[in-house]
């Protein structure tokens, strides 16, 4: 269930990635305010849905009688049980390290691609230069998401693999359109799509086979490999219009796989670390710690980028090697914590490697 929820969340990320540049350029004059307005509209819709959910939850509590159950109420002192748990702190720190290597990177990724890829704008009169192509790409993106998402819930093998095949074909088509548009933002927008496709699959695997801690380790390894590829391999292909984009797409898709592995295994592990009545508090503390990293590391990336490019005035000529190595080092720290978590899990019998569903 959590894997499916996160897959839909990744679709939201992809929507913002593909439509933000579209709205910014709408009308022929670039204006960030239109993209911001688009985000505000989405937030208003989310607020309405949250209010509806609140009342639905209240109604459910009144029907089941859970609202009146106070046998074991929450106490502030219960937070001490969370803060003194070694497993919780390992997961919280792993979370802040991993997400700090992902979300701040998204802020700079498009410019990084512009600096390392040889992109030639299509002719102004060609199909690929028209704003309507964005709509076509988004429809294909929805096909990737819908077919891949639906394939996870099919019991018939033919239908399951047919939908999966359709999703993969649509994904390849989307990548081809990004190449033809010669647009860095269109190329990077593929990042969340593989996560939409495989996160429910990983969630199902976690439910039936376990291995959450191992998935955290694997996700960290992929993260390190991707950032180092962006830092050292991609610049080697600058001037190679096809080779550079192939390397970029491959690395972005692998990073998307990492972005599926870690969240799909990290968030369902929290209930195994803390008491049921403090799960909400545990998640809140983790998000609080995570947001510290999401505030700090974009600033650090900017400082490092400025320090390593002192005389560069053209934004398409920045050298991103140092910031990418810094992000890879966060992945190394997350990897170490992943191995520590496996040791703690084995020592304390937390059950992170065990399946959620036992028959």
Residue ranges of model-derived segments:
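Glycine-rich segments within core transmembrane alpha-helices of 12-TM secondary carriers
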Residues: 1-24, 287-298
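Interfacial helix-cap and linker-helix signal at transmembrane-aqueous boundaries
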Residues: 19-28, 113-114, 205-207, 301-310
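Symmetry-related core transmembrane helices of the 12-TM Major Facilitator Superfamily/SLC fold
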Residues: 34-53, 321-340
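Flexible cytoplasmic inter-helical loops of multi-pass small-molecule transporters
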Residues: 38, 54-78, 348-358
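Extracytoplasmic gate region of multi-pass secondary transporters
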Residues: 86-148, 170-195, 263, 297-298
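Helix-to-loop junctions at the C-terminal end of transmembrane segments
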Residues: 148-155, 198-211, 305
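C-terminal transmembrane helical hairpin of 12-TM major facilitator-type secondary transporters
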Residues: 163-178, 183, 189-194, 212-266
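A late C-terminal transmembrane helix in Major Facilitator Superfamily
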Residues: 276-310
């Amino acid at each position: 269930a959590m894997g499916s929820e996160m897959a839909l969340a990744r679709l939201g990320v992809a929507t913002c990635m593909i439509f933000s540049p579209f709205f910014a350029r709408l009308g022929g004059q670039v204006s960030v305010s239109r993209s911001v307005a688009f985000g505000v509209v989405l937030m208003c819709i989310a607020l309405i849905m949250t209010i509806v959910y609140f009342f639905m939850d209240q109604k459910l509590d009144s029907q089941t009688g859970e609202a009146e159950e106070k046998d074991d109420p929450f106490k502030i002192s219960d937070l001490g049980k969370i803060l003194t748990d070694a497993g919780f702190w390992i997961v919280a720190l792993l979370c802040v390290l991993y997400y700090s290597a992902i979300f701040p990177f998204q802020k700079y990724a498009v410019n990084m691609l512009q600096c390392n890829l040889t992109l030639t704008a299509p002719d102004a009169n060609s199909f690929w230069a028209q704003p309507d192509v964005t709509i076509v790409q988004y429809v294909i993106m929805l096909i990737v998401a819908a077919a891949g998402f639906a394939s996870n819930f099919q019991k018939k093998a033919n239908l399951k693999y047919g939908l999966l095949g359709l999703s993969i074909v649509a994904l390849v088509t989307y990548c081809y359109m990004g190449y033809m548009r010669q647009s860095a933002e269109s190329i990077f927008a593929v990042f969340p799509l593989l996560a939409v496709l495989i996160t429910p699959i990983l969630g199902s695997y976690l439910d039936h086979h376990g291995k959450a801690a191992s998935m955290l380790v694997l996700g960290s390894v992929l993260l390190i490999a991707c950032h180092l590829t962006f830092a050292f391999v991609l610049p080697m292909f600058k001037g190679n219009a096809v080779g550079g984009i192939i390397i970029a797409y491959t690395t972005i898709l692998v990073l998307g796989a990492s972005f599926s592995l870690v969240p799909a295994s990290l968030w369902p592990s929290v209930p195994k670390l803390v008491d049921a009545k403090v799960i909400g508090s545990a998640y809140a503390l983790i998000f609080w710690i995570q947001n510290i990293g999401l505030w700090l590391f974009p600033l650090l990336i900017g400082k490092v980028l400025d320090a390593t490019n002192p005389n560069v005035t053209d934004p398409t000529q920045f050298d991103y090697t140092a910031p990418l190595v810094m992000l890879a080092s966060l992945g190394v720290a997350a990897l170490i914590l992943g191995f520590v978590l496996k040791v703690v899990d084995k020592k304390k019998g937390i059950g992170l490697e065990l399946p959620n569903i036992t028959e």
